[in-house]
């Protein structure tokens, strides 16, 4: 009994520090993670120059790194109070509204950011995700078409290519989706979850071979599972699609875009 009391005394403060960031449609509470020092360092840097927008963004990014998304939203909002026309602040706050399933607010921020600066990759990419979530697949395809040429690295090129293929497919533009795969804009291979999904779309691997032994993190499982489920869905197999969407949600990787969209898919009749 004494040992149990000691354990509870250690765990309880951690629960208080790790705030509830999101409650799923099933009532599951998802919490932030513990800060390992990045937030403290960012706060210290900001304290030395509290009106420095770059340092405000750095603090919000550090908070996001441990899934403190609601805290990050407050930080970016603080920045917008100082710099109301800063497109990057809208990019980051819109992203975190998306993470916390505040889709209308995410759309507003990302659209405003795009009007302020149309050259920021992260604005178009996350705007595409929001439009996909809202089932505006044509709008999502347009956003990912804008994102793809300005992708900063191979990992982001794979992500943009993947979401563009899914958006075109769901919009009924199957020929354009196939032409995209044939063009291979994601080359060289990034070696991430999106690259693995693209191999499935191209017929290079079977659905049962998409996962590797290394794919164990919650985000990776959520991402791969949604991609496989959507692949089945566009091929007309809604039963298998649903089972993969359920696997995505069960992964617990709640910030993953795949899990966010899986929740939406599972609410459809």
Named regions from a protein language model:
Residues 65-66, 99-100, 133-134, 166, ...:
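Register position in tetratricopeptide repeats
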Residues 53-54, 87-88, 121-122, 155-158, ...:
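Helix-start (N-cap) detector for alpha-helical repeat units in TPR-like alpha-solenoids
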Residues 15-54, 58, 65-66, 269:
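N-terminal leader/linker segments that initiate helical-solenoid repeat arrays
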Residues 27, 61, 95, 129, ...:
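Residue-level recognition of tetratricopeptide repeat
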Residues 44-45, 78-79, 112-113, 146-147, ...:
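Canonical positions in the second alpha-helix
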């Amino acid at each position: 009994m004494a040992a149990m009391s000691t354990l509870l005394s250690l765990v309880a403060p951690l629960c208080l520090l790790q705030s509830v960031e999101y409650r799923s449609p099933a009532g599951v509470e998802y919490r932030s993670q513990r800060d390992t020092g990045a937030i403290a360092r960012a706060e210290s840097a900001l304290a030395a120059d509290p009106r420095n927008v770059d340092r405000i963004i750095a603090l919000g990014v550090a908070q996001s790194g441990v899934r403190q998304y609601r805290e990050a939203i407050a930080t970016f909002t603080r920045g917008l109070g100082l710099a109301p026309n800063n497109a990057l602040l809208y990019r980051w706050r819109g992203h975190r509204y998306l993470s916390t399933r505040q889709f209308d607010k995410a759309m507003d921020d990302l659209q405003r950011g795009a009007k302020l600066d149309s050259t920021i990759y992260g604005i178009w990419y996350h705007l595409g995700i929001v439009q996909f979530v809202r089932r505006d697949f044509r709008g999502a395809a347009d956003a990912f078409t804008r994102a793809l040429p300005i992708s900063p690295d191979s990992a982001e090129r794979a992500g943009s290519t993947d979401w563009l293929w899914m958006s075109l497919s769901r919009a009924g533009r199957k020929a354009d989706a196939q032409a995209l795969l044939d063009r291979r804009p994601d080359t060289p291979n990034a070696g991430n979850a999106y690259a693995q999904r693209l191999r499935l779309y191209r017929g290079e691997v079977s659905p049962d071979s998409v996962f590797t032994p290394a794919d164990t993190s919650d985000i990776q499982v959520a991402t791969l599972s949604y991609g496989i489920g959507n692949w089945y869905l566009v091929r007309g197999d809604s039963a298998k699609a649903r089972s993969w969407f359920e696997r995505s949600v069960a992964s617990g990787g709640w910030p993953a875009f795949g899990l966010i969209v899986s929740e939406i898919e599972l609410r459809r009749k």
